[in-house]
Regions:
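Outer-membrane beta-barrel transmembrane strand signature
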Residues: 54-87, 91-93, 184-275
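Extracellular/periplasmic, surface-exposed regions of secreted and cell-surface proteins
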Residues: 1-190
Length: 276
């Protein structure tokens, strides 16, 4: 009854909300077959190197990875809200959805330095966190013309989604102050794009000869006319700054944080005459 004043233009309105949480046995390797190592919460032993004692070749037994007594599931929690609506006797209708998903306690290795005398590897721990967020809008217009003999419609879909690593252990090279800190996944999406940065095509013979005269090499080869000249961005050990050559160190540049499309859209329509 409270919607009666709007009934001449508002035909439908529905608000939706949902919440759910579930366990997930995937780890940072994201391997669908080799997930959590069996019995990694127990101390295991394995055969080690063989040694000669007197005239006999003897096997040895060594301890496996330090067990993780607190091993548990990763937990995925999803929040979703939506709105269904219709206007003008449902000639214009649509839906809007937004979601947020958080996954915590993802199993993965920690990047810690152990003394060589420790003698064991560390078992992976449930520590990493990752989140997803996004939304989708769908609109449809449907009407009739020519005294109802023609039925036509048009639609538009627009979606956005983004993921982010919230907690993730990385090598010191990727941490604050490291040479590859710009490529850290922390706070970024999975699947960032990295690679060489093209500067320009070598179309001037004089420029090519000048580069050769300086001893400039690209992966051990002389630059050549018509080839791509890449930017010299890093030196040995990924150090920032040019070193007079292009090699594998120069491949570590952040090209884009969007390894997968973040925005998807589509539109279209249809028309019928006398139901055909």
């Amino acid at each position: 009854s409270f919607m009666e004043p709007t009934s001449d233009w508002l035909s439908n309105l529905k608000i939706r909300a949902s919440y759910g949480t579930t366990g997930n046995d995937m780890d940072l390797s994201k391997d669908p077959i080799d997930k959590v190592d069996a019995f990694s919460y127990l101390q295991k032993y394995k055969l080690g190197e063989k040694y000669i004692f007197g005239n006999n070749l003897a096997n040895t037994i060594v301890a496996g990875a330090t067990p993780n007594y607190a091993l548990t599931w990763a937990t995925s929690t999803t929040y979703n809200g939506g709105l269904d609506f219709g206007f003008f006797n449902n000639r214009l209708s649509g839906t809007f959805d937004a979601f947020y998903r958080k996954e915590v306690d993802i199993l993965g290795p920690r990047t810690v330095t152990l003394p060589s005398t420790y003698g064991q590897a560390l078992a992976p721990e449930n520590y990493a966190e990752r989140s997803w967020r996004g939304g989708e809008l769908a609109l449809t217009w449907m009407d009739k013309a020519a005294n109802g003999e023609i039925t036509y419609s048009a639609y538009l879909h627009l979606g956005f989604a983004r993921d982010r690593w919230d907690v993730l252990d990385e090598d010191a090279t990727y941490r604050e102050g490291g040479n590859l800190h710009a490529l850290s996944k922390q706070g970024k999406a999975e699947g960032i794009l990295t690679g060489l940065i093209a500067d320009h095509l070598l179309t001037d013979p004089a420029e090519v000869e000048a580069l050769k005269a300086k001893g400039f090499k690209q992966f051990g080869r002389d630059p050549y006319l018509g080839g791509i000249l890449y930017k010299d961005t890093r030196g040995d050990g990924y150090s920032e700054g040019p070193d007079g050559r292009i090699d594998s160190n120069d491949e570590y540049n952040l090209l884009s944080e969007n390894g997968t499309p973040r925005i998807n859209y589509g539109f279209g329509g249809s028309i019928k005459w006398k139901g055909i």
